[in-house]
């Protein structure tokens, strides 16, 4: 209030502070609008702050004074972004091929204007939605957030849902031991998840592909033909599915039996029954347990969603390669669409490993293109101010003779 009076400000406004663990508060800034996090206040007060803002804009007084507010419980807000946490949180650009929001209730709220099929571009902030939850205390709110993130499914482009879920489960975060070094300290658990995947998930992904084939080639609607799924005269009653994950080929073999299949993968055998409930749900019985597994299926592959994490499997392609977003040894490519803000090298320049060659900016994030080794710049294809697309070759790079040797 004193800050607003000091500048003769009249109207709706919010003041931001940084608060230490001991309660010491430091002024940050004042905005002439609501904050992005205003739903947190709405959840614990039961007030509609957007209505308040409109009333104040019309010259009306605040509907309630501070002492009239009643604070109940604890609320948290997570911003679901199209970004790549494991790659420095760079924005992810593309079309959302599948989008499923958590079920909303008095304890779970989703604020978003994004729908399935929308394009995330370089021209706007890549936020997909705000997910706000309420609980009677911080522990209950964290549990609610974990459950809600587990129901939030996005496919078609990178996103931070899995990162947010790992953060919610992080002991430092759960105990509110928060500072700007948290992510760096917890890098191994937050940004470098294990590449290991359970046999059950591999077999489930393969079963989805197998059942999808059957759905695309249905048998006649005669009860006789429905008694043995996949039965073929004079052929082995088994089927092989191959998928790729993280550059490795995964091969699962299914043998039909009276009830479901026996799946063989990596030397293990598992009895499994499954049915596609709809385009995004697999009902299965695995290891004696019945469960439902959410998934998304595109021309490129299958993504499974389980407990806030997503697991992507690609269909087998003969031309599959493991080239990363930085390109090969001899070229460097744009990791995302954006504008070239600096070009720091020219043809024939000698550079050292990790030297910054140029910088690229998209959606308020600057990304540095660095030399992978000591070498020489053969060509630089763009100038400052040029717009580039993801995958555009930016620099042709040659290793020094001693590096090659």
Enumerate the language-model features and the residues they cover.
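Catalytic P-loop NTP-binding/switch module of NTPases
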Residues: 296, 300-334
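A conserved acidic, glycine/proline-rich C-terminal tail/linker
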Residues: 270-288
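Structured functional modules or segments
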Residues: 322-405
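Conserved metal-phosphate-binding beta-hairpin within the catalytic cores
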Residues: 9-35
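Active-site phosphate-binding and catalytic loops of NTP-dependent enzymes
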Residues: 4-11, 59-67, 291-292
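C-terminal amphipathic alpha-helical interaction region
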Residues: 267-268, 305-306, 347, 355
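Catalytic cores of soluble metabolic enzymes centered on carboxylation/carboxyl-transfer
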Residues: 18, 35, 39-269, 390-396, ...
């Amino acid at each position: 209030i004193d800050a607003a009076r000091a500048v003769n400000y009249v109207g709706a406004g919010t003041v931001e502070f940084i608060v230490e663990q001991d309660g010491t508060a430091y002024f940050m800034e004042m905005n002439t609008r609501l904050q992005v996090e205003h739903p947190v206040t709405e959840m614990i007060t039961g007030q509609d702050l957007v209505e308040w803002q409109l009333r104040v804009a019309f010259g009306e007084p605040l509907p309630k004074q501070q002492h009239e507010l009643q604070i109940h419980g604890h609320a948290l807000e997570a911003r679901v972004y199209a970004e790549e946490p494991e790659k420095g949180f760079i924005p992810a650009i593309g079309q959302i091929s599948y989008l499923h929001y958590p079920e909303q209730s008095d304890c779970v709220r989703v604020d978003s204007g994004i729908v399935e099929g929308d394009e995330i571009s370089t021209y706007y902030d890549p936020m997909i939605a705000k997910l706000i939850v309420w609980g009677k205390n911080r522990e209950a709110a964290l549990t609610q957030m974990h459950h809600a993130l587990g129901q939030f499914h996005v496919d078609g482009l990178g996103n931070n849902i899995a990162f947010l879920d790992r953060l919610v489960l992080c002991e430092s975060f759960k105990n509110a031991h928060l500072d700007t070094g948290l992510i760096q300290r917890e890098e191994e658990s937050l940004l470098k998840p294990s590449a290991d995947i359970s046999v059950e998930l591999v077999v489930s992904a393969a079963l989805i592909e197998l059942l999808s084939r059957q759905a695309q080639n249905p048998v006649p609607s005669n009860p006789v033909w429905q008694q043995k799924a996949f039965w073929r005269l004079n052929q082995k009653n088994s089927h092989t599915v191959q998928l790729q994950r993280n550059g490795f080929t995964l091969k699962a073999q299914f043998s039909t039996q009276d009830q479901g299949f026996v799946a063989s993968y990596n030397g293990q055998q598992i009895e499994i029954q499954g049915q596609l409930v709809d385009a995004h749900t697999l009902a299965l019985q695995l290891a004696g347990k019945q469960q439902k597994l959410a998934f998304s299926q595109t021309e490129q592959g299958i993504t499974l969603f389980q407990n806030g994490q997503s697991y992507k499997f690609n269909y087998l392609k003969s031309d599959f390669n493991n080239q990363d977003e930085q390109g090969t040894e001899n070229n460097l490519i744009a990791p995302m669409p954006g504008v070239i803000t600096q070009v720091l090298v020219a043809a024939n320049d000698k550079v050292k490993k990790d030297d910054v060659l140029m910088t690229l900016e998209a959606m308020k994030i600057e990304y540095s293109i660095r030399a992978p080794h000591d070498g020489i710049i053969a060509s630089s294809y763009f100038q400052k101010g040029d717009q580039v697309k993801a995958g555009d070759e930016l620099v042709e790079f040659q290793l020094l003779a001693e590096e090659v040797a």
